[in-house]
Amino acid sequence: WMMIVEQKCRVIVMLAKCFEAGKKKCQKYWPDSKEAKTFGRVKVFNAEEVKYCGFLRRRFYIDSFDEMMSVEVFQYQYINWPDHSVPNTTSNLVRMHKYVIQCLEETGSDAPMVV
């Protein structure tokens, strides 16, 4: 989360689920919906989770104790990738991509997107 704060990132894109075929693929690095968790000198509040067809959008509020600032960060997670396969159609992935681009434009930030 320090990298998100330091680089002023406003959008995170995740293309994997945390588990695939019952095996852990990645660490869940965010708190549950409507909860906060502190990671070192950064507090992350998961303000909202919205489920779309094939993906989730989470809205986080990030508080940096070092920089005395609070920022809004969005995470888009594609959840329709089948275990050990490829999606039957790309329509949901393309739809998520459009939402990501729109979000980047709305934030007005030229900071990097984290994928």
Curated annotation (Swiss-Prot):
**Which residues are noted in the entry as substrate-binding?**
D83
Judged by the first EC level, this protein's enzyme class is hydrolase
Tell me the superkingdom of the source: Eukaryota
State the family it belongs to: Belongs to the protein-tyrosine phosphatase family.
What's this protein's name? Tyrosine-protein phosphatase 24
Q: State the PANTHER family in the record.
A: PROTEIN-TYROSINE-PHOSPHATASE, RECEPTOR-TYPE TYROSINE-PROTEIN PHOSPHATASE
- GO molecular function per UniProt: protein tyrosine phosphatase activity
Q: Which UniProt keywords apply?
A: Hydrolase, Protein phosphatase
Tell me where in this chain the Tyrosine-protein phosphatase domain is found.
1-115
